[in-house]
Amino acid sequence: MIGYLFGNRVLVDDKELPLIEAYYLLDKGELEVYEDDKKLSKEEFLKKCLTYDERFLIRYKAYKELRDKGYTLGTALKFGADFRVYDIGVIPKKGKRSEREHSKWVLYPVSKDETFDFYEFASKNRVAHSTRKKLLLGIVSDKIEFIEVSWKKP
């Protein structure tokens, strides 16, 4: 596939890919990205991605880990999260959906060195709960660990 960098998106045929999905496909050798008439190397494209998102690599590592395992991820900006994650085998669609077709988690990738206070943690958990999803923290270091958090009423 061939894509063309256009701001913070990559245009492929009649689709717009977010930078993170374009980088994933480039990383797998399934996409070539051009800016104007110049083919970008993986390193050049990564630099472009980092100009839009300084946390790109942290987000990408968690994204890649789940995509490689067969999960589908989408943006979760409207939920105040980085990504929404669909169970393996679920294809997101618009319109009326069964319970199984909704995303199961909202994902917040964080570096193992990052800290956040209880209020920030509670805020992330409330967002997940209010959207009927579970909170998934992706702890990124040399390896990626995922922690699933559920909201319980006493």
UniProtKB/Swiss-Prot annotation:
Q: Which GO biological process annotations does it have? A: tRNA splicing, via endonucleolytic cleavage and ligation
Q: Is tRNA processing among the key words of this record? A: yes
Q: Which GO terms describe its molecular function?
A: lyase activity; nucleic acid binding; tRNA-intron endonuclease activity
| GO terms under cellular component | cytoplasm
Annotated catalysed reactions: pretRNA = a 3'-half-tRNA molecule with a 5'-OH end + a 5'-half-tRNA molecule with a 2',3'-cyclic phosphate end + an intron with a 2',3'-cyclic phosphate and a 5'-hydroxyl terminus
Q: Where is the active site?
A: Y86, H102, K133
Do you know which Pfam families this protein is assigned to? tRNA_int_endo, tRNA_int_endo_N
First-tier enzyme category under EC: lyase
Look up the EC number in the record and give it.
4.6.1.16
Gene3D superfamilies tied to this protein: 3.40.1350.10, tRNA intron endonuclease, N-terminal domain (3.40.1170.20)
Annotated keywords = Lyase, tRNA processing
Q: Which family does it belong to?
A: Belongs to the tRNA-intron endonuclease family. Archaeal short subfamily.
**What is this protein for, i.e. what is its function?**
Endonuclease that removes tRNA introns. Cleaves pre-tRNA at the 5'- and 3'-splice sites to release the intron. The products are an intron and two tRNA half-molecules bearing 2',3' cyclic phosphate and 5'-OH termini. Recognizes a pseudosymmetric substrate in which 2 bulged loops of 3 bases are separated by a stem of 4 bp.
Oligomeric state and partners? Homotetramer; although the tetramer contains four active sites, only two participate in the cleavage. Therefore, it should be considered as a dimer of dimers.
Name the chain's protein: tRNA-splicing endonuclease
